[in-house]
């Protein structure tokens, strides 16, 4: 779900 998040 984000550039620095896995989802």
Swiss-Prot record:
One of its GO terms (cellular component) is extracellular region. Belongs to the FARP (FMRFamide related peptide) family. The keyword Secreted applies. Keywords: Amidation, Neuropeptide, Secreted. The keyword Secreted applies. One of its GO terms (biological process) is neuropeptide signaling pathway. Its main location: secreted. It comes from Hirudo medicinalis (Medicinal leech). It comes from the Eukaryota. The modification Phenylalanine amide is found at residue 7. This is FMRFamide-like neuropeptide GGKYMRF-amide. It is found in: Secreted.
């Amino acid at each position: 779900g984000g550039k620095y998040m896995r989802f």
